[in-house]
């Protein structure tokens, strides 16, 4: 069965695992998901991520994301929201890039220079597709 929106699936898996205080979450691998995981890691929302090669019975590669919690299990990932969807794409020019919670959160932008945060895209003066908000 094909998935209509694999990015939304990834974000939902992360949100659900975070709400249930799971230490790790696995999902089907793709390059865009690995790039999103790298952005989340660089911004401090997750501990680490890795790619598991398939076993003999498995179908394809898996992306494993290690979630990050504070000293008394406070969530570092308070919220995550998909913005641009397959049915309604959302694009923003460099001067119109959204700020998430007044700069406390991060918008993940798909640009011609790869996936960037809203701050990085503003600094490089590039716009693109607004994939998600994370706070």
From Swiss-Prot:
One GO BP annotation of this record: translation
Any single Pfam family the record assigns to this protein: Ribosomal_S8
Entry coiled-coil feature ranges: none
Entry superkingdom: Bacteria
A GO molecular-function descriptor: rRNA binding
Cellular component annotations (GO), alphabetically ordered: ribonucleoprotein complex; ribosome
Keyword terms, alphabetized: Ribonucleoprotein, Ribosomal protein, RNA-binding, rRNA-binding
Quaternary structure note: Part of the 30S ribosomal subunit. Contacts proteins S5 and S12.
Matches recorded under HAMAP family: Ribosomal_uS8_B
Family: Belongs to the universal ribosomal protein uS8 family.
Function noted in UniProt: One of the primary rRNA binding proteins, it binds directly to 16S rRNA central domain where it helps coordinate assembly of the platform of the 30S subunit.
Name of the protein this chain belongs to: Small ribosomal subunit protein uS8
Organism annotation: Salinispora tropica (strain ATCC BAA-916 / DSM 44818 / JCM 13857 / NBRC 105044 / CNB-440)
Origin organism lineage: Bacteria, Bacillati, Actinomycetota, Actinomycetes, Micromonosporales
Record gene name: rpsH
């Amino acid at each position: 069965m094909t998935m209509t929106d694999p990015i939304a699936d990834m974000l939902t898996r992360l949100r659900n695992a975070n709400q249930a205080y799971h230490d790790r979450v696995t999902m089907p691998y793709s390059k865009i998901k690995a790039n999103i995981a790298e952005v989340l890691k660089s911004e401090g929302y997750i501990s680490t991520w890795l790619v598991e090669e398939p076993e003999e019975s498995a179908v394809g590669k898996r992306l494993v994301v290690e979630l990050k919690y504070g000293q008394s299990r406070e969530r570092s990932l308070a919220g995550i929201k998909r913005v641009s969807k397959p049915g309604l794409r959302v694009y923003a020019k460099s001067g119109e890039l959204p700020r998430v919670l007044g700069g406390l959160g991060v918008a993940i932008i798909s640009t011609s220079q790869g996936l960037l945060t809203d701050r990085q895209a503003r600094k490089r003066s590039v716009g693109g597709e607004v994939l998600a908000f994370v706070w």
